[in-house]
């Protein structure tokens, strides 16, 4: 795991993590957040609907970027304050997701 200082960062630098989302991940997230929406927890009902299976919570997926920013790039001590996203496709249990951050601008320190 690489940790970058401000000086190490440059426009175009990319950091990412990949994670295969498991049944246990979805169950843990459901329990922690209280989001028991049937889309995430009821396989029988979900099979009859648009996605044809349970889907992973979108906010669980969005949270993966915290791993990238807080642990990889720039790394420990980093606190990000904004995140914009658009969910283009559903994520299913056992899908592998890549959460990626790229430096698009580097402002002067201070």
Region spans (language model):
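Hot-dog-fold acyl-thioester-processing enzymes
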Residues: 1-79
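Hydrophobic beta-sheet segments that form the core/acyl-binding groove
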Residues: 81-110
């Amino acid at each position: 795991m690489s940790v970058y200082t401000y000086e190490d960062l440059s426009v175009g630098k990319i950091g990412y993590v990949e994670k295969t989302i498991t049944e246990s991940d979805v169950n843990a997230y459901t329990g922690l957040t209280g989001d028991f929406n049937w889309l995430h927890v009821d396989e029988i009902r979900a099979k009859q609907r648009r996605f044809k299976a349970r889907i992973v919570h979108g906010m669980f997926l969005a949270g993966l970027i915290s791993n990238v920013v807080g642990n990889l790039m720039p790394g420990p001590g980093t606190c990000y304050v904004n995140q914009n996203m658009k969910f283009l496709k559903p994520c299913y249990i056992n899908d592998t997701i890549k959460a990626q951050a790229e430096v698009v601008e580097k402002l002067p320190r201070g």
